[in-house]
Amino acid sequence: SSPDEANQAVAEYKTTLNIQEGDTVDESITIPPQPQTSVVVMDQYTGEVKAIVGGRGEKTASFSLNRATDSHRQPGSCFKPLGVYAPAIDTGKYTLASLIEDSPYTYSDGTPVNNWDGKYIGQATVRYAILHSMNVCAVRTLTDIGIDTGMKYLENFGFTTLVSKEDDPAHNDYNQSTALGGITNGVYNIELTAAYAALANNGVYTKPILYTKVLDHDGNVILDNSTPETHQVVKDSTAALLTNAMQDVIKRGTGTAAQLANGMPASGKTGTSEYSTDLWLAAYTPYYTCSVWGGYDSNKPMENIYNQTWHEVMWKNIMDRVNTTLGLQVKNFTMPASVEQKTVCSVTGLLAVSSCPSYTEYFAKGTGPTQSCSGHYEEEEDDEDDDDKNKEDSDSQNSQDSEDNEDSGNSDQSGDNNNNSGNNGNNNGNNNGNSNGDSGTVTPPEE
C-alpha cells in the first residue's frame, strides 16, 4: 500500500475511537516501503551465509523483523525442482528425456490444473517442463512418483514449515498442489536458499550458519559453529542434471533477466504465487547461491505491476557485484562421472536411429533408454503400369513440431495455493525415456 493509502486508513480508524476534545493522544505511525524484499547469499560449500537482507528501507520500528529468516512466503514454482523433479530423477523413475503428458488435467477433487500461459503442447520432456515451468507436467509427475515421496525429499532439503499428517490429519501439505508450491505456511528465504545450495553442492545439504565462532575477551572459543550439519539429499548425478536443466531457465526461460554480465553461468528457478503475491528467484553460480523474494507484507497481489522481473534484475545486480568485488573467474558447472550422454529420438525418447529427429541428453548412468526407436518412415508408391508393377520405397522423415514460442519475460503462474488435493494415482509420466503416446511432439533442448 502507498503512504497515502496507509494514512487514509489510519484516519478512518481514528474516527472509531471516540476521541473527545481535551483527550491526550499519543501516536506513532511507521510505514515501511512496499513492496518489500528479502535476500540471502550463501556459500554452498561451507553453509556460511555471506549476506542477508531482511527488508528494504530504513528501520525505524520493528527492529527485530528479518523477512529472510522470519517471514514464510509461498514459494511458487521454485518448489518444482525440489519436490517433484529431484525425487523423480533421484529415484530413477524419470530422466530429463522422459515424456510427460501435457494436456487438460485436474486435481483429484476435480479442480483444473492450469498452465500459467493457458496452453498445452501434448507431450513434453522433463527438461522442457522445467524450462517453461509447466504446471500440468509438475502435478502429473508428483502424482506419479507419490506425494509421500515428494514430501520426504522436501523435508530432507531442510524445510521446517511443512505441515505433516501428524501435525494436522485433515489439513496438511500432503496434496498435489505442493508440486506448484501451494503449501499451508510458505517457506523462509534462508531455507529455500539452503535447498538450492544443496543442488549446487553435488546434492549435499549444508545447514546454513550465520557465524563460525564466538570468542571471549581473551580469545577463547565459547561457541564453535564452524562445522555445520550436512547430509546427502540427492545423488550427485541428480544435482548435476537439475543444474544443467535449470541453466536453460536463465539462458532462455523465465529467468533471462538474471543473466550475469561477465558470462558467469547461473542455474536456478523462478517462482510466482497466485496473483503474483510472491515473486522469487532462487539460483546459483559455481561459487554462491542467492535467493531473492519480493512482495507486499500484507500479501497484496502484484499482478497489476507492469515489471514482473524486478526481482530477477535485483538478483543479477547482487551477483554481478559479488563476482566483480571478489574477482571471481568465470568457470562452468561440471558433470560428475556418474553422468553420461546419449542421443535420443525427440519424438519417442528412445535411442535415436538415423531416421529420427534427435538430440543429445544427459543421463545418470544406467537410467538412459536402452531400446532403439523403430524409426520414422512413410511408404510412397509410384504409379503402377499394367505391364510393369515396380515399386519404389521412399523414406520420409517426420519433421518435428516447432516449439511454442514462449515469452521468456513472463513470470510463471504457480496455481492456487493451499488447495489440499489428494493423490489420484494417475501415472502420466513416461519413465526412462519411453514414449507416452502420440499426442504431441517434444522439442529437444537447444545447445
Region roles according to the model:
Residues S372-E447:
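Ser/Thr/Gly/Pro-rich low-complexity, disordered linker/stalk segments of secreted
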Residues L142-I145, K152-F157, K165-Y174, K207-T212, ...:
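Short coil/turn segments at secondary-structure boundaries
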Residues T111-N114, G146-L192:
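Mid-domain, small-residue-enriched loop/turn segments at the edges of structured enzyme/sensor domains
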Residues V41, T46, S71-S77, G118-G122, ...:
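Secondary-structure capping and boundary motifs in well-ordered enzyme cores
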Residues V84-K93, E101, Y105, L131-N135, ...:
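Sec-exported extracytoplasmic/periplasmic mature domains
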Residues S1-I31, P35-D43, A51-V53, E58-S71, ...:
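A penicillin-recognizing enzyme superfamily signal
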Residues K93-G150, N175, H217-T243, Q247-D248:
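Conserved catalytic neighborhood of penicillin-recognizing serine enzymes
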Residues G47, Q74-I100, A129, A194-L199, ...:
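Active-site SXXK
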